[in-house]
């Protein structure tokens, strides 16, 4: 049994089922995909630019309750000054509750549950020790874009889903299943029992991401920038690959590295 859960961390006390989203992209995606889950949208009346007018017009056309506010109150609501003048109070969406359930659905249907129809086999992104919410948000965004089925991280020493993560993810935090597991190495072992090939990234690996077959069921495992994967995580992987670096810098940010790996997998799968 693979243990998994989606954890939300809110910056403002609310009911157990509600949370705050902020930023044009995150709120806009929620209004577009699940308007009935949006209780109300607070917006900065001091913003009178074209983008704000277009946003409030779309929200109003969708039947969303609009509440006039100001920048300071919005910052207090979401815990960030990067709200762009928009904060929404929303209901938590129904999520796949466990990684087991997700994988069983994939196995039963044999069809892609992600956004890209060319992805037939499970494509998972595993993050080991990624604690920065901006990095997590960017990883969720690229995982959603590449058609990955889920992102997995350990419960300890990892960022949870917060308003900042949702804002950076630009709506992907609402659509991409994010599972936080008790024991990452054990979870990788259980994925391997399901014939999912676990491929870790390492600067000293002989083969590059472009040298391996990514068309089968795979989990791409990446560590935090600088520290990399923990030793046990590294040992549990079936194979290690590197991302070739041809310039002065030695490594990529974890979200950029995730994008390189996921889109190489997508490229290979589209060619099959």
Model-derived features: where do they sit?
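Short beta->alpha connector loops at strand-helix junctions that form conserved
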Residues: 70, 91, 128, 154-155, ...
